[in-house]
Amino acid sequence: YIGTAGWNYEDWIGTFYSAKQSARYNWLSYYSKFFNFVEVNSSFYTFLTPKVIIEWLNILIDNYEFKFSIKLHQSFTHQKSFSKEDVKKVYSILKPLIEENRLSGVLLQLPYSFNFNAQNFDYLRLVCELFLDYNIFVEFRHNSWINEKILNYFNDNKINLAAIDMPLIGDSLPLMLNKNQEIQY
């Protein structure tokens, strides 16, 4: 599978999307002609509803191979303030994707300030354990997380390290793949 982080970008008009669009022009439908995967970014900023997910699935009803990954809401990854109700909201949007075999996984994108220590490792395990029934992809921004303890935990629990390509600044992470995981993200 190959795709991008999101598909709804105004600056893609005229380069990827047609500069002249009819009222029926649908960006997701067009995007799906070139890619078979997308990382949903909007779920980081707002809790999506199952209705939105079902609308996307209806747009792609004939494109059976297309998959979505859902980025966890910032209350899980950046604010550390999620509630039981927030967990239920995430499960509710995953459900239609699972029913249609369209879920690639759940992405935890962690901030640069989230460095490795015992407290943060415990928190990471807590969040991961909520979603162990799904493919989990963890995107670290701080290189302190690349250690044997983490890689063993990931391998033991089939959690996937997301490879990111970003400028090396301070203690940021270099581009790397975990050769022990089945799925590369």
What are these regions (language model features)?
Residues 1-185:
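Residues lining hydrophobic/aromatic ligand-binding pockets adjacent to catalytic sites
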